Amino acid sequence: MRILFFHGHTQTGPVFERKTVRLREHIQRAYPGSTFFFPTGPIAYKVSDRLDYLSEIQRERSDNFKDPDLIETHAWFRLFEDDPPRGLLESLDIAAEILRVEGPFDGVICFSQGSVVGSMMASLLEGPRRRQRFDEYAASFPGAVRYPKSYKNINHPPLKFGITYGAYMGTSPVFNAFYSEPLIETPFLHFMGEFDPVVPSEMVAAVDKAQIGGSRRRKVMHPGAHAIPVGDRYHEAVVDFIRSACETSPTYFDLPSDEVPLLSYNDTPEQTPFQTPLLTPSLSSAVSTTSIPSSEATILATRRLDQWEKSRSPRSNIRPRSTRRTVFSGRRSTSSSAESSAASQHSDHFEATRTPTSSTSTVQMIEPTVNKEPNLAVRVVEDDTIVSGSEYEGEGWQELLLSDLLNEMLRRHGRPGRFYFVPDGEGGRLENGMRLN
């Protein structure tokens, strides 16, 4: 198995190689002796070139920004330029040379901007019908991209498969010959993050409508952001897709529905990519289409999560004190008014009772309602399980247990609720829980 990897914007081949270690381990186990090739995009970036659209949180958190231009970053083409953007056609020529010198390759795995190059390359390898489409479209649309000369005499078979993470595509009319009439029929598996703040929703819809992968395309939504999802089940899904795509039978690929969430396609063959000038996503366009946390809120939430990570090593002990339990909702308080407020806030999950011998209320967790999933219930812990003098003591720690960033994500997707990190009172182990309204 020989696989070509295309990195994302402002990455490099070696960086992408480090980010795919676990994925490649799974592929190697399934296909011993597999080889992987990690080219670097031709456009050299200074980090200062990208500060205009990086969020404030990225600048705040990274020490590299103290001397940003010492970092080597590359891209396959420039963002926010006229169609075709500078570097894109050059990158396709570089890909063709790699196919000649290092090929043949069985498939391609791409992240973000690399998915534009990877899907276009797969399209150009699909035979004379694709070249004919370029000629026909150029006759009717003078500004269209022409069939690259570097692919006219290339001796490389069509790719057997393609894998993309956080994909987008060229949606300008100048690129139509790559995607339509015929569709790209190379089997593609697309991973999309449910909380991806980089690729806007209209770009995800464009990838759907372009039907990249034809009848054998597949899309997996993962509960993450603009990144390669972590977890063996996702890497095994890639292996299963490769195995399915490399078989001669054009059967549809299926993932275990109990482990990996799927999104079925309901589009029709006649649907084509959006006819808009948008080619590349940005944080600014994402903000215009999707409500995301403000920079200040994001920075605050990230600092709290950083605090929490530091507090875990070495981990302080949490001592169970009694069977009395109170709601732990982000602030330390054992007053009856605070408990009444918390109980009211979570009335569908908790009930409050008052014991005659105590001045404080006891709040007990009850079973979730029928419409709620049990694993989404908020954990309840004792307020006094925090050992005095430990790193966990004080309102600062209790406030950071409540991740503002995750709550913003929940609200953004129409699922208002609260996300908690809470101690379970057993050896200091921290667990998480979620409550949806």
UniProtKB/Swiss-Prot annotation:
Active-site residues, Swiss-Prot/TrEMBL:
S112, D196, H226
Mutant phenotype after disruption = Greatly diminishes the production of fellutamides.
Q: Which UniProt keywords apply?
A: Hydrolase
Read off the SUPFAM superfamilies from this record: alpha/beta-Hydrolases
User: What domain of life is recorded for the organism?
Assistant: Eukaryota
| Protein's GO biological process | secondary metabolic process
What Pfam families does the record point to? FSH1
Question: Compositional bias of type Low complexity: which residue ranges?
Answer: 314-345
GO CC, one annotated term? cytoplasm
Q: Which family does it belong to?
A: Belongs to the LovG family.
In its UniProt entry, what is this protein called? Esterase inpF
Taxonomic source organism: Emericella nidulans (strain FGSC A4 / ATCC 38163 / CBS 112.46 / NRRL 194 / M139)
